[in-house]
């Protein structure tokens, strides 16, 4: 009993893994916000190209968040727009407008794990995860970095195919509940992508925005970096911004 009792007490004090993931998600969703984004894609050989993006987001009741993303530069992607409806407890919805085709189409579930505009980020990385799509468990507590280390596994094969990985390991700060790193494993259980959070922008409502993050593809040695600038929170955003019609303007 000497060893068992302390272990039981530690387990009782440890928050449920799904609750930690849910809290981390909720802290990253603010009332309204606009910003510019630089997306830089670096090839294995060192050459790089950048995309300039504008983003406006607004949150609603029950964890619903809507986001409009518009590509400004370079010329070959200018006018491309995305509408993201980020649901907390149900499937996210995404649409993309392609100016060359003058057509808006819905990004279907099977495309969620595919590349976001040829970067190392996936379409799913552009949304907050639906907590119920995964089972979550603690792997260990890292005393050195003061982190929760949580493994998230898709609840079934369909969800695994949808997200494009067999499991994800998240490193979350214990004191602030902020995700600091994510590791993604393929269907052969091999680590193939790492996303690291480089900096956080604190918001006035006690929440936060991931200001700078980098995705490294271990298979291709490509790297993609997202950096936010000109961040304005609490902006007045009309609901008409988040419509198919606005995508095509």
Where are the regions that the model predicts?
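Boundary of Sec targeting at the N-terminus
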Residues: 11-13
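N-terminal mature ectodomain segment of secretory-pathway/periplasmic proteins
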Residues: 15-100
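Short amphipathic beta-strand and strand-loop transition segments with alternating hydrophobic
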Residues: 55-58, 135-142, 198-200
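Gly/Pro-enriched, hydrophobic low-complexity segments
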Residues: 83-85, 93-96, 103-107, 112-129, ...
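Long terminal segments
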Residues: 244-249
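Bacterial N-terminal signal peptides
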Residues: 1-6
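A short, amphipathic edge element
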Residues: 18, 49-51, 126-139, 189-194
């Amino acid at each position: 009993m000497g060893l068992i009792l302390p272990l039981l007490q530690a387990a009782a004090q440890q928050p449920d893994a799904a609750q930690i993931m849910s809290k981390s998600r909720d802290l990253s969703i603010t009332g309204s916000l606009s910003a510019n984004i630089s997306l830089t894609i670096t090839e294995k050989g060192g050459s790089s190209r950048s995309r300039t993006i504008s983003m406006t987001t607004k949150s609603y009741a029950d964890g619903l968040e809507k986001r409009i993303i518009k590509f400004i530069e370079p010329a070959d992607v200018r006018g491309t727009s995305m509408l993201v409806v980020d649901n907390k407890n149900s499937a996210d919805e995404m649409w993309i407008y392609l100016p060359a085709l003058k057509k808006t189409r819905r990004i279907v579930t099977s495309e969620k794990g595919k590349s976001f505009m040829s970067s190392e980020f996936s379409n799913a990385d552009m949304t907050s995860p639906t907590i119920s799509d995964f089972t979550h468990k603690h792997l260990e507590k890292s005393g050195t970095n003061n982190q929760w280390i949580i493994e998230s596994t898709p609840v079934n094969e369909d969800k695994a195919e949808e997200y494009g990985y067999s499991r994800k390991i998240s490193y979350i700060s214990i004191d602030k509940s902020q995700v600091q790193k994510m590791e993604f494993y393929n269907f052969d259980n091999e680590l193939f992508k790492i996303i690291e959070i480089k900096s956080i922008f604190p918001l006035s409502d006690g929440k936060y925005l991931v200001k700078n993050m980098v995705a490294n593809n271990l298979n291709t040695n490509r790297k993609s970096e997202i950096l936010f600038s000109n961040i304005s929170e609490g902006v007045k955003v009309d609901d008409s911004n988040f419509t198919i019609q606005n995508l095509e303007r």
